[in-house]
Structure formats: structure tokens, C-alpha cells
């Protein structure tokens, strides 16, 4: 079994429980700030800014705005991929995919208190994580999802159970998760749920987050 990273203690599991990943295209004309603010009121515990279509200047501006929004609530901001933006805005975390900067290089660049998440798409990735300074693993995708199509076939619940048996590192499940399947994903071994369209596309992100948070807290 892969053991937890020496840095894993820096990530409180509670902060990973309901993890919003932004997607402006799902927001239905609303600003990201409006969606995030509503979701925070509903109980989101972590927010990842993932807007790959933005140029560096706009991405940084969005990151700074979200950090200001989240700070009074003590909710960590995670930056997807962009180490430079994470450093510039003082983000609390960074999430890296398989094609992003290698984790070991990112760790050298980031302050020790900044936590790192890493997406895993195969059991080989999970095994490799034992040698990496990662604080949580993003298991992606659990179910098929239209918000991210450049991935391998979905893990499914049994795949998630296999990952849980293979590692003690905290697991955040993402991909096609909603109120109808959230409980079974948690019971399969996820420590937290990352959601995109379930909140960003919701008519009322506050109510949607509240429903998810109630399910999570009941498990």
C-alpha cells in the first residue's frame, strides 16, 4: 500500500470534503465570483480555479478576486496547473495533472505550506505517487463527464475502491458526481468530492452545495 505523503498532515481532510472546481462555461452567464460566493454559502470547503482558456493576466486577476472572496471564510484557494499564478496570488494549494509540471519540480518552487494535489488516471499513477510529495490524489474521472473529455475511461466505483486499497493518501473523487451518486462515491473510499457542473451549472449554487454538504456530512 502506498503511504501518505510526509506533507499530508498540512491538508486537513475537512478542507477537501466539498471541493468546487470552477468552469466559466457552465456558469450560465454568471460571474465566477457570483457562483463561488453562493456555493460557499452552501458549504463548499475548497475552491480550485481551473480556467485554461484565460490568459495569464486574466487568470491572475480572477485568482486574486477569488482569494479575497474566500479568505474571510478560511476556505483554501487551489490553482490548477499554474505555479506562477499560485505564487503570485498566495494560493493555499496547487493541483497538477499528468501533463502539467512534474510534482517534484513544483514542490521545489512552492512554499512548504502550499499543498499539492495530483490527478491519477491509472493504478500505475497511484503507485508512482508513493515517491512524490503529494498531499492528496484527484481520482479522475469517476464517471463520464462532459466537462473534461481528455481522460482515460472512467474509474467507476470499483476502480475507486481499488485506489483506496492501494494508498492511504487522501482521495478526492471527481467526474460526473452529483447528489444522486455522492453517497456511494464516499462509501467507495473518497475522502472528498470535487464537483464542477453540479455547482457551476446549478440554478442556485447555494442550494446545490447545501444538498451535497448534507449528504457528505451524513456519511
Curated annotation (Swiss-Prot):
Name the InterPro entries for this protein: Aldolase_TIM (IPR013785), ThiamineP_synth_sf (IPR036206), ThiamineP_synth_TenI (IPR022998), TMP_synthase (IPR034291)
Q: Which domain of life is it from?
A: Bacteria
Q: What SUPFAM superfamilies does the record point to?
A: Thiamin phosphate synthase
One BP annotation, GO: thiamine diphosphate biosynthetic process
- The residues listed in the UniProt record as binding Mg(2+), with positions renumbered to this chain, are 81, 100
Which cofactors, if any, are listed as required? Mg(2+)
Cofactor details (free text) = Binds 1 Mg(2+) ion per subunit.
What EC number(s) does its UniProt record assign? 2.5.1.3
Q: Name one GO molecular function term.
A: thiamine-phosphate diphosphorylase activity
* Family listed: Belongs to the thiamine-phosphate synthase family.
Protein name per UniProt: Thiamine-phosphate synthase
Species in which this protein is naturally found: Albidiferax ferrireducens (strain ATCC BAA-621 / DSM 15236 / T118)
